[in-house]
Amino acid sequence: MLVLGLGCGSSKSSSPDAAPTSDAPGNALCGPAQGSATVTVTRHGVPASGVAVVYQCPDGRWADVVRTDADGRATVDVVADSMLTIGGPWSNDPNQFEYPTLYTIMGVQPGDQLRVEPEAPAHDLLAQRDLTLPGAVSGATNYQVRSGCDHFDQFTSYPASVSVLAFSDCENVDNTARAWIVAGDSTGPLAVTYADFGATSPEPVVLPDWSSFLITPTVGVENAPAEAAAIETATMNAMRGEQRFSDGHPTNSPAPFSGGVSGMAFYTFPQDVASELEFQVRVGYDDAQAPNGSAVFYRREPFTASHTIDMGAAALPRLASAALDTAAPARPQVSWTTDGDLSVADAAVVEISWLGDVQEQWLVLAPASTTAPLVLPELPAIPDAAAPPAGATFDPPSVRFIEADWLDFAAIKQTGLPGLTDVLQLYAPDIAVRAPAGTHLLRASVF
């Protein structure tokens, strides 16, 4: 699955309550304010107070620093098309997801309500339920147990009974839950059994007889670019907006692919188990630097027997290169070249990373109309929102353009940073970026 992986952020420590710099030029530097924008910062669902929020003019000059309050909010008077950069450090728990050291949102408008983490519903444990299986499956060498929030266990021999957890944000509004078990061998799945049950009900749950897996649909690709060095197709079964079972088929070099690949069959759940099918196609232009290339993602409901993806019509233009200019390390510049017009996308996501005292990252969310080179904004001399230092060692940049038929840039700005890591999945856990029911198209071009 192609995702916007962000890796690990800075591990340095600085007080989030440090006083803002006293030499701020002030908001007037950017011109008369046209309204206010609010950013809400949480860490793992908990409001983060004292986080530095740097206000920058449309030309990138920094004007002021404000800090989030006890509710994790900061409100700034802004002009149209300004920028906000949120500083770190981020993670309260070194074992949890670490955010970039710096996160810049470009194209900020008066009235924007921005987030740095998706708004998370309550995650309360409702119950632990015991399930009785219907018997062993002949030839099965593994049994996968799944339930809400993608809770997962695996057994290498037949378990007569298993336990699953039911959480408030993973079940239906009527507190019903679903659990299912997939029996398989080294070649793939063999059978599935599942049951819906009251998440808080004390009655025992006995799973029904096993159902056989289907081996449909087929997914083919036509009009693949001549430069393609790899094509991968995959399917994801989904239920209640979460991925439940996936199957993929990479087709690697030698190229060319004569314009595409023929339809290949995929394992899927029986249609009464998973109500929706998502499938994806990824074209890689460089085996050595995959996933550089164009990715096309679909979600379909209901299941159909076969699909053919016309890459010529569906793919975003190819990103052919990306480069980083660090002649002025405090304001690096990222440039890219493309085979076509990427302004048709919804957003650009640019990431740089460097090694100074520790490994650091800077993620920039920008309108797709942004032209290269993208000059990163100026930052104040404060420890928790500091620019890359002189002498830093930089990694190659990452550039991504994304477009979804149910999103626009205004919506993406409100998704929250972890949502950006999943915006290339139609079943993203962030409800703000998850595709609604029906047939949808998500496209991405990545270097």
For each feature predicted by the language model, list its residue ranges.
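Conserved aromatic anchor
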Residues: 326-343, 376-378
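Signal that preferentially marks extracellular ectodomain short beta-strand elements
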Residues: 165-171, 261-273, 371-398
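Preference for solvent-exposed, low-hydrophobicity sequence contexts
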Residues: 37-42, 51-326, 421, 430-446
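Flexible internal linker/loop segments at domain or repeat junctions
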Residues: 314-321, 329-334, 353-360
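C-terminal structured domain segments
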Residues: 375-436
